[in-house]
């Protein structure tokens, strides 16, 4: 499904929350949406690696990296694995790397910036917890939609207006 966030905002103004405009689109898929799966981690992408190995059909991984601009929480290998396992997209409140390869990957990816340094893998982080960034709270099981216009969150699945 191709999502257009302005159209969703117009059709469901009482349902959506708009994330502050701080993210850039890096993925090969410009528009994406799905059920939220959250990870909260700081400069450690161990849980990201675990989750992209799982079936992600209809889901978007929302990674609260604390806004760190010192390490990349996603690179080409994990992005390609996520695409292979059916993830709709990944939103990273932090950095990613290998952006040229990720731009060719059939996956939606939005992040704050790119950074060439990988993270440590110490197994530290929390899965499926409520996270807040960009003025919006992301709850597992709710829905997120993203495109070149921005990122929105809804408590229920939204259909594109006909």
UniProtKB/Swiss-Prot annotation:
InterPro entries: RraA (IPR010203), RraA/RraA-like (IPR005493), RraA/RraA-like_sf (IPR036704)
Reaction(s) the record says it catalyses: 4-hydroxy-4-methyl-2-oxoglutarate = 2 pyruvate; oxaloacetate + H(+) = pyruvate + CO2
GO molecular function: 4-hydroxy-4-methyl-2-oxoglutarate aldolase activity; metal ion binding; oxaloacetate decarboxylase activity; ribonuclease inhibitor activity
EC number: 4.1.3.17, 4.1.1.112
Class of the enzyme per the UniProt entry, highest EC level: lyase
One Pfam entry name: RraA-like
Binding site for substrate: 75-78, 97
GO biological process terms, semicolon-separated: regulation of RNA metabolic process
Residues at which a divalent metal cation binds: 98
Alphabetical UniProt keywords: Lyase, Metal-binding
Cofactor: a divalent metal cation
Function comment: Catalyzes the aldol cleavage of 4-hydroxy-4-methyl-2-oxoglutarate (HMG) into 2 molecules of pyruvate. Also contains a secondary oxaloacetate (OAA) decarboxylase activity due to the common pyruvate enolate transition state formed following C-C bond cleavage in the retro-aldol and decarboxylation reactions.
Name of the protein described by the UniProt record: Putative 4-hydroxy-4-methyl-2-oxoglutarate aldolase
